[in-house]
Amino acid sequence: KVFGRCELAAAMKRHGLDNYRGYSLGNWVCAAKFESNFNSQATNRNTDGSTDYGVLQINSRWWCNDGRTPGSRNLCNIPCSALQSSDITATANCAKKIVSDGNGMNAWVAWRKHCKGTDVRVWIKGCRL
């Protein structure tokens, strides 16, 4: 599913990401824009053999199990396919675990490159939330 910007913002808010660990909703929407272009089906293979999945491009080496990543830790205890659903419950719950891991949203390269230090309110502008 390719989410609309405000549609994804609303879903993220519903799942408790707004101000989770101090990160406003705009940060999450911005990260999703640059990680996946709001596409829940997005996958990207990494040079280490792991794959990133879903709107927030969550990695199979650490966070989910795709059955093909050597030494996968699966710290969110989910199949990676759950991160590709149109229902973002698994993505939101796993993202909360990731952002609590010590580096905050710096865990997302796209967030560091495109969102960090910017006015992320633009990402929820005009949305009825």
UniProtKB/Swiss-Prot annotation:
GO terms for molecular function: lysozyme activity. Coiled coil: none annotated. One of its GO terms (cellular component) is extracellular region. It holds the Pfam family Lys. It is an enzyme of class 3 (hydrolase). Signal peptide: none annotated. Belongs to the glycosyl hydrolase 22 family. Lysozyme C is capable of both hydrolysis and transglycosylation; it also shows a slight esterase activity. It acts rapidly on both peptide-substituted and unsubstituted peptidoglycan, and slowly on chitin oligosaccharides. PANTHER family: LYSOZYME C. This is Lysozyme C. It comes from Numida meleagris (Helmeted guineafowl). The gene is LYZ.
